[in-house]
Structure formats: C-alpha cells, structure tokens
Amino acid sequence: MLYQQIAKNKRRTILVMAGFVFLVALIGAAVGYLFAGTATGGVIIALVIAVIYVSIMVGQSTDVVMSMNNAREIHSADEAPELWHIVEDMALVARVPMPRVFIIDDPSPNAFATGNNPQHAAVAATTGLLAIMNREELESVMAHEMTHVRNYDIRLQTIALALTAAISLLVNFAGNFMWFGASSRRDDREEGAGGVFAIIGSILLIILAPLAATMVQMALSRQREYQADAGAVELTRNPQGMISALRQLQHAEPMQNVDPASAALYISDPQENARHKSLSGLFDTHPPLEARIERLEKM
C-alpha cells in the first residue's frame, strides 16, 4: 500500500509539471500573438525566460530561502543536540548526505527542506517545533523533510517557483504594453471576427495566467506533502509518530514572520490556522491535515 501511494503521487506530479510547462508555453503564445503576430516566437521566448529563471533559482535557492525566513544555521550538535542527531540519523536512513541545518526563532511548530539536490540540501525547524514535539514526532517530521530531499521535491518546488515568476514577468510585460500591442495588431489589418476573438482570447489568457499558475503550484505542493508523509512512514517504520506529529500541527497558530513565497515549502501551512482552510482547497498550499492523517491511518 505504501509503495503504491508513492507511485501514484509521482504520476500525479508528472502531470502537474506538464501542465505548468504547457501554461508557460500558452502564455508565451498569447503574448507573441498580441505583440508580434506569431505565437511560435512567443512560445520560444517564454520557454527561454523560464529556463533562465529556473537556472538562477536552482543555483541560489538555499541561501535565498533561508534568508527570506530569517533562519540561522547551526554548525554542530552542540547548538541543538537532539535536532542535529535526528537529522543525521534520518539522512543516513534515507541514504542522502547530511544536509545543512537551520533553526527559525518562532513559537509556531513547523519545518521545511530546500536546496537543489540531495548533495546541496538544507532543513529548517522552528523553535516551536523543537519545544513541542517529542522525539518520535520530531523524527517523523525530519523523515518527512528527508523524503522531500531524497525525492528531489526541493528542486521541483524551486522550479515551480521559478516558472510562476516567469509567468508573472510575461504577464507584467503584457499588461504594460497591452494597448500598444492590440493597436499594432489592428494596424496589421487583421480586424476580422477571427482576429478579434483571437485577440480577446489572448488578453483573457494573460489576465487569468497568474491565477492558473498559482493553482498549479498549490496542486503540486499538496501532492508532494502526501508523498512525503508516506515516505516518512517508510523511513521510520512508525506511522503513529507521523500521525501524532500532524495532530500536533493541527493546533498550531500561524507563524509570526514568514515569506508567502516560501509557504508551500513548510510541512504545514505557516500562514493560517490549520482549522481554517479555504472551502475549495484550490488555493491551499497544503492538503488538510485531517486528510493527511486519514491516509496514514489507512496504510
């Protein structure tokens, strides 16, 4: 059952990422059609911009994300013995190198992993997590984060952030020159019904693209959390430890200072109380904790 769930989530993730790339190409086509009269050129430019953003983000992700979240690095077990040794143990079990370890001074229990690959990864835990969780719960949380590292989720989330930023750049460009572009298209004497509908469709796509990108990014984050929960059980052989940790997180208050751009990285939504989720769930960075617990209980 465990390995079937992991395989299922991996297939879903591939579909989500394919949708992300398709969205980048689609917005590029719309921008290209509006301003140059050719969709092909826009697609090429959009994909090039996306590749550049991804390359920059992947190379600098750890330091940037840790700085955004006011995390301080610890360099030895002397500074946080229990956390250090648990991370060390979970990395050994997951067969990944020991990641860099950071602590965030915040009373709300939470944690996340970041980096571009298992060889250049980092994990962070809040002081609230260290104060509230017992050893089994903390092991499960770190095993959850090690699963993100082992499965390259950290790189995947970085790519998703970069693609969202690329789409925002394209949309901002289109918005700044919208009327100029539309006028240019009219000057090309393509004022027939088909041309008008194409222009209107392109404009609507540009307007809705950021919303769609956010929805795709959130869907990606939600699927990775389910998989990381299953991976934590695989590493610890202790489903009750993970269930207990998630129950602790159900009572957590929002973090005091967190960058919205990195919210999807955390094990639980750091921006709002877990008991108050959106009705549709489409814009939630994480699946409901109760749903995650139910899946673990069925294993």
Swiss-Prot record:
Cofactor entry: Zn(2+)
Gene3D superfamilies from the UniProt entry: Metalloproteases ('zincins'), catalytic domain
Keyword set includes Ribonucleoprotein: no
Residue ranges that the Swiss-Prot or TrEMBL entry lists as coiled coil: none
EC numbers on record: 3.4.24.-
Bilayer topology annotation: Multi-pass membrane protein
Note describing how the cofactor binds: Binds 1 zinc ion per subunit.
Domain of life: Bacteria
Enzyme class: hydrolase
Family that this chain belongs to: Belongs to the peptidase M48B family.
Name of the molecule in the record: Protease HtpX homolog
Annotated source species: Limosilactobacillus fermentum (strain NBRC 3956 / LMG 18251)
